[in-house]
């Protein structure tokens, strides 16, 4: 079932069933709209990381940093989002946040598991 409601000029609301949301024909953002916080993070990681062990390391960092909360804000440092990025923007989706975190992790640590090892030692990454 698909229902599109247009309000005014710029807002379009599309409702899809959970089964439709898993269809590869839909954009990742639309598919994520029916997922809970943890599922969104898992889905975003899976778009970028193929290795199961690396995905698990990434997921562990996300949980420790924000409990999968995409709107999390550290008032002391200004870091925000699932990954607590210092350069994160409040309007970024979980997918965008994860893309940015992935670039950072590959640049700084080479792998998510190396980043997680560092995180375990220092409680930041």
Task: Name the predicted role of every residue range.
Residues 1-36:
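N-terminal prepro-regions of secreted/extracellular proteins
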Residues 37-125:
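Peptidoglycan cell-wall recognition and remodeling modules
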């Amino acid at each position: 079932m698909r229902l599109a409601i247009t309000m005014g000029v710029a807002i379009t609301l599309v409702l899809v069933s959970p089964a439709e949301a898993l269809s590869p024909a839909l954009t990742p953002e639309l598919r994520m709209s029916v997922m809970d916080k943890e599922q969104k993070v898992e889905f975003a990681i899976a778009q970028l990381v193929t290795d199961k062990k690396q995905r698990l390391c990434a997921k562990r960092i996300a949980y420790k940093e924000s409990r999968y909360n995409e709107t999390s804000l550290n008032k002391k440092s200004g870091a925000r989002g699932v990954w607590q990025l210092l350069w994160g923007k409040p309007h970024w989706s979980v997918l965008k946040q994860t893309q940015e975190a992935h670039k950072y992790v590959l640049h700084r640590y080479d792998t998510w598991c190396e980043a997680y090892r560092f995180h375990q030692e220092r409680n930041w990454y």
